[in-house]
Amino acid sequence: MEKRLGVKPNPASWILSGYYWQTSAKWLRTLYLFYTCFCFSVLWLSTDASESRCQQGKTQFGVGLRSGGENHLWLLEGTPSLQSCWAACCQDSACHVFWWLEGMCIQADCSRPQSCRAFRTHSSNSMLMFLKKFQTADDLGFLPEDDVPHLLGLGWNWASWRQSPPRAALRPAVSSSDQQSLIRKLQKRGSPSEVVTPIVTQHSKVNDSNELGGLTTSGSAEVHKAITISSPLTTDLTAELPGGPKNVSAQPEIPEGLATTPSTQQVKSSEKTQIAVPQPVAPSYSYGTPTPQASFQSTSAPYPVIKELVVSAGDSVQITLPKNEVQLNAYVLQEPPKGETYTYDWQLITHPRDYSGEMEGKHSQILKLSKLTPGLYEFKVIVEGQNAHGEGYVNVTVKPEPRKNRPPIAIVSPQFQEISLPTTSTVIDGSQSTDDDKIVQYHWEELKGPLREEKISEDTAILKLSKLVPGNYTFSLTVVDSDGATNSTTANLTVNKAVDYPPVANAGPNQVITLPQNSITLFGNQSTDDHGITSYEWSLSPSSKGKVVEMQGVRTPTLQLSAMQEGDYTYQLTVTDTIGQQATAQVTVIVQPENNKPPQADAGPDKELTLPVDSTTLDGSKSSDDQKIISYLWEKTQGPDGVQLENANSSIATVTGLQVGTYVFTLTVKDERNLQSQSSVNVIVKEEINKPPIAKITGNVVITLPTSTAELDGSKSSDDKGIVSYLWTRDEGSPAAGEVLNHSDHHPILFLSNLVEGTYTFHLKVTDAKGESDTDRTTVEVKPDPRKNNLVEIILDINVSQLTERLKGMFIRQIGVLLGVLDSDIIVQKIQPYTEQSTKMVFFVQNEPPHQIFKGHEVAAMLKSELRKQKADFLIFRALEINTVTCQLNCSDHGHCDSFTKRCICDPFWMENFIKVQLRDGESNCEWSVLYVIIATFVIVVALGILSWTVICCCKRQKGKPKRKSKYKILDATDQESLELKPTSRTGIKQKGLVLSSSLMHSESELDSDDAIFTWPDREKGKLLHGQNGSVPNGQTPLKARSPREEIL
């Protein structure tokens, strides 16, 4: 049972390698080695900071590094320098060795055994540097530093080296696509072969049931050994391992005669079609078996030598459909050891884009391919054995089934053609020729034709002919298709000489005239010729000889005849063309005798007029005659006198001055023979019957303020003669306010403006030409403004003519800021002059949908409040006054509001609370009762009077008290202190007792120093104080002496 298998590339590990110089100039490598060592010395000295982290080990040149597993190598991004590569490896704990290859820094993690393998490149551009880090020196799977010379001393055959295929993917320091691009670029550069150190062979199962494109594989799943190989060119090199013999010799393992077989490289292209050249035999080399003590993987087990097998898949195979099967055989030059067999693995490398097919025997020596589609297929066969590996390539080209060619068919159009001079050019089309593939060549050849200087021969699809001469031509068209098949056909062309046909004379149709007409014009310009007429000649036919006639223009196309008489005239026209050919034509003119009939007069239909129409027209233009009417005459034959006829001698006359009655007017017409005819017309004039006009006004009008204009339509009024005047009047009971615009009260439509609330009644009077009139009545109802109570008016300090639309918009915007609403929410209803220098603006404020209108008194109060808080110049115009349009003050229910002054008019016995008006909101009111104010005022006045009297009395009592003056005398030391209280002359005043003076009293009396009098003169005169001896006046009791403290109080 077949299974669809996919052939995938073998995921062997790979590594980059540089250019390998194929020169024996050792001094160049020595110079490069010296330069590199010098750079590392400078690098070591300039990186003291990193010296504590890692130390430089030995450096190996011409040696590369290969990963034994996955993700042990990674490429440092960018274009680093050698110093930055070394520093990066030191800073990375996973980096133990780095490989410097032509400006690329490849770092490696070789901390695990079998993770890294070294191989020799023999290129001075390849350098491997070991770094000594903490606890990592023993873990490296490389050769000891002392064993480096063993690798450098190997004798390699450079001519047999090949670049090793990739076996291990680098760590993804860069993107996978970039790595693959870089790898392919390095692989194309071509470098010498490399030697791979042996590794331990690992086994893994490979699932052979994977799909590859459209190919299917039959067979069962097999288990193969995954063997690491060095290159596809069968080079088997084994490097000397540490501890092994230093002398290595290369032993060819192929028979004689094959050692000199040249090796060819596989040629691959990135295009769709790729060609792979099979790899012939290449020499194989082997070296000494390594010792078990030293290996790159730090293992004691010996590594087997991989033997390179020379594999051939045969020559390239090419088949052509319908054959779609092919068999590929793989051949191995070396025979397998006894008891062993080779395993085969066929892989599809290159294939066409949309391909399909089946593979059978994918893991056998013979691969059978079937059901292949056209295209190029490249197969690779991998042969593996015990410690042996080889590859071979072969191409299979499947060509499409060859097409069976059909010869083309030559087609010319037209096949037969005839032209006449002066036409001397034409074309013959051969592009309609057909072929099953493609016509690649057209060839025209003139087979037959008149004698000329040069025959026609062209290689175009369309044959263009010119300067042809009269004669018969035969042209041959030969077409060639893409396969070389041909076909021919012919085309015939006849060129005739120019033909000059005789002219065709045309003298026109026969003519008939009647006397007295005796002249006519004949036209011969309808005569034709193919090349043109050169002359015309008119003549009288022999049958008309002897006729009297005058002829003019006998040598022109037009003949004028006159003075003809009654009879038949035959004229002959002779025309001549450019070569003298002539043609004739005849025309007959019949002159009939005169047959005159009298004219037919037609005065027109009767007419009926109604006064005041007193004029009309009389039309006789429909009168007729067989010849010609030469005169018209209008006359009044019946009717009242006093009429006037204008243009009475013409076909159309005008009658004026008609009166009530019946008139008869007669028309007389005459022809050239003085024959005449008459016709009459009646004109009836009736008295006027006037009907009075009818006045009609279209419906009543209802408007709602603030709309204050209206129009009344009286144009439907009618009259039989026409209305001559309209007059609109206002009823006496209508409001007097309102204006008539443009004197429209005398027009059919009345325009009114500035109407006020109320009902207007208007009367329309219409009058006709006779003075009769009619009237109609209508009303105009003006309803109050539903927003009247919410209207706010502002008196602005600006002339109304100076308030522009821009200033208005700015002012509305400022009002919106004060009220906290949008500009569109403020609807201005009216702007009108208030005084000569002020303007009144009326508006209302509504909110956003559903457009609810704010209360007018709240808006006015808010504006007043906000303006008090703002600066005086906040508005662009000073607001002189802000109020509602209608006065909405309740006047404390004791008065009414004056709509003009917007203030309260209080009822009797009530007055305004001026304190509230002045100190609070300033709103007029009628809160105070006059009676209460009078009582309160009286009480206040009385209280103030009492208070004033009390204050005055207190002040007077204070002023009426006598002041006590103390008189002191200086006493002798032996005298006693005494104080005499002098009696007053007033009766009824008690006298105070004497108070003895002492030194304390003397000091206390100094508080009232203004009243102290020192009476030194009394002492000098020897006068004694009253009561000095303790006596008291009669009738008085001695006062108790006060203590000094009481005296002070």
From Swiss-Prot:
N-glycosylated. Residues 1028-1037 have a biased composition (Polar residues). SUPFAM superfamilies: PKD domain. One of its GO terms (biological process) is proacrosomal vesicle fusion. SMART domains: PKD. Keywords: Cell membrane, Glycoprotein, Golgi apparatus, Membrane, Phosphoprotein, Repeat, Transmembrane, Transmembrane helix. Interacts with RTN4R. This is Dyslexia-associated protein KIAA0319-like protein. It comes from Pongo abelii (Sumatran orangutan). The gene is Kiaa0319l.
